[in-house]
Amino acid sequence: MAPDLKQYPAYQSSRPYTRWWWLHGPFRQQDIVYQLDWLNANGFGGVELAWLDPTWQTRPDAPPRPEWLGEEWSALLGFTKRYADEIGLGCDFTLGSCWPFGGSRVRPEDAAQTLDGASPQRLYGSWESGPRPVLNHLSADALRRYADALAPAFAPGLAGTPSALFCDSGELDAGRLWSPELWDAFEARYGYRLEGRIELARTQPHMRYEYRRMVGATMQQAFFETFADICHQLGAFARVQAHGTPTDLLSAYASADVPETESLLFPPPFSRIAASAAALAGKDLVSAEAFSCIYGIVGLGDLRAARYWRREQPADLKLLADALLAHGVNQFVWHGMPFNPPGGKNEFYTSVHVGPDAAFASELPAFNEYLETVCGMMRRGRPYANLAVYLPNEDMLLRDRVPDDQRTPGAMFEWEMRQVAPPPETAGYHPLWISEPFLREGIGVDGDLVVGNVRFSALYLNVEWLASGALEQVARLAAEGVRIVLVREPKLPGMRRNAQYAGWLAALAAAPNVRASLAAFDVQPLMQGASVPPYWAREGQGELLLFLANPLAAQVRYPMLYGQSLSESAIDCPVTITYGGVSHEVALRFEPYRSIMLRVTRDGQATVLDLDYVPPPPVPDEQTSSEQKRG
C-alpha cells in the first residue's frame, strides 16, 4: 500500500531540496552531519542522494569508496537518514548509481535489448566496479528483480520518515529499444511482424510510429507503473523524471507520486507537461531538477560555459526559477551539491555548484526562502483549468531527429517534446495538456470537459495526425456536448486503416459544438493583454492565486546568457483578468528582477501580494550586453 503523501517531508514543507552528489570520499559521519547542518541553516528542506564516479576529477589521493551496496555503504545511508530525520530534513535516494537503471545487479537475461539483439549501451560513471549493463526497461519482471537486489542495502535509508525513490531521466538507446516478448505482442496489436522489417521500423515514418507506440505503451506499464508499485511496497514514494522515453508523457508522469521535470536542458515551457499530468491525476507536487547546465555544459568542452563555471549569478537563477514556477512547478531540487568535508574540493561537472563555497552562498538563505514562499502559495487549492489542449504525441512520434539548429545537449528525437508548447492563441486560457488516456476518462457536463476533479470549458486540438482511439474519444465527447475546437482535420497515422475514422470525422464536422476557432465559443480567456507574461494559476475557496513571472522569463532558453536577467527599468503589462464572470483591469508593473503574486476574488478584488526577495543586479559580459542592445 502506498504511504500517505502527507507524511512526505517535501509535502509538509516547500523548502527546496538539493541533489547530493556522492563522488570522492572519505565518507565520514561527521562530514555528513556538517553538510546536512549547513543545508538546514541555509533554507534547504532535504536532499536526494546520487552516486557517481567523478571521472572528470581525478584524485589519486582519494581513499577507496565503500563497496556499492555493501555493509559500510548501507550503514552510511542509515546514518544519513536518521540524522536528516533528527534535524527535520527530507532524504530521498536514487535507486541505483548513474542513470538509467543498470549495473552489476542486472541479470544477463534482464539486460536491455534492441531490435538487433543485446544492447551495447553501458552505464558510464557508475560508482561500482564490475559489469554495468543497462536494465531492460520494457520488462516488469526485470525491474522487480533489479529492485529486489538493491532493496536490502537501501532498507536502512528507507526507515523512519517516508522517503522518495528517484528515477532520473530515461537516457536510453531509444532509437532501437526492444524486448524479445514484443515480437508476438506487436503482431497481435498491428497485424504484421517486424522481423525482416527492422530497417523500415527505423526509417518508414508510419511503421516507425507503430514501433514507437508499442515501445511506449510497454514502458508505461512495465516500467513507470511497476516502479511506482515497487516504491510503495518498500514504503517509499516514487519521484520520477519520465522524459527521454517515447511514452505518452502525461501518463508516465501521472504514474509517479511526484512527477519531476528539469531545466535548463529542457526549456521551462516543457515543465507544463509534468504540471498538466499532476493536475489531471490529482497530484499535489510538481518538482523540478533546477538550474542544471544554466550557462552550458563544461564537461562537453564548452569554453563559454567554462568561463562562467562556478560563477552563477542569483538574478539569473531567479529568472530561471520564475520561468519554471510560471509553468506549474511547486517544488525545487537544486542541481546540485557535491559531498565535501569542510574545505573539500569535490565538484560536479555541470552547474550549479551548491555549498559553502558557492559563488552565491550569501544569497542562499533569502533565495531559498523566496522559493519556499512561492512554492507554498502554488500548492494552495487546485490548478486552475480552462482549456484542455491535445498534446501532439502522434505528430512527434511520426517525426524523427531533432533538427540540428534546434538541438541541445542530449536532444535526439522530436518525440522528446523539448520544444513543444501550447499554441500562442491559447496562452491567455491557462492551457493544460491532455492526451488519449485522459480523454478516455473524460465526460461531458453542460458543455464542459470533466476529467477527474478538473473541469475544462473546451477541448482544443491542432494536430496533423490523430490516432483512431483518440479520435473516437473526441467524437464521443462531442456527442456528449463538449465544446471542441478542431483547428484542422487530422489524419490517421500508422500502417493500418480504420473503417470508422472517416465517420468520426464526418460526425465532428456536423456537430454544432465543434468549431475551427476559439473565437466561435463564448469561452473567456483568464488573461488578455497586448503582452501576457508567463503565469500559473491555482484556484480555491473562491479566490484565484496567479504567479506572474517577470516578462524576461519568457526568453529563458538553453544556454542562458551570463547576466541575461539584467534589467534597468520596470516593465508595464496592463491586462484584463476574467474570473467568476467578472473582469478585472489590472495594471501589472514588474520592477527589475521581480515577479508578481496576484490574488483575485470572485467579488472583484485584485490584490498584489508582496514577494520580498530581490537578488543583486547581475554583471553581464560583453556578449550579453551586445545582444540585449540588439534586442
Spans of features found by a protein language model:
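Bacterial/eukaryotic Sec-type N-terminal signal peptides
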Residues: 1-2, 630
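Acidic/proline-rich low-complexity IDRs
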Residues: 4, 114, 122, 608-610
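Carbohydrate-binding surfaces of carbohydrate-active enzymes
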Residues: 12-17, 22, 28-33, 46-49, ...
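Surface-exposed aromatic
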Residues: 60
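Catalytic and substrate-binding clefts that recognize carbohydrates or anionic sugar/phosphate headgroups
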Residues: 100-156
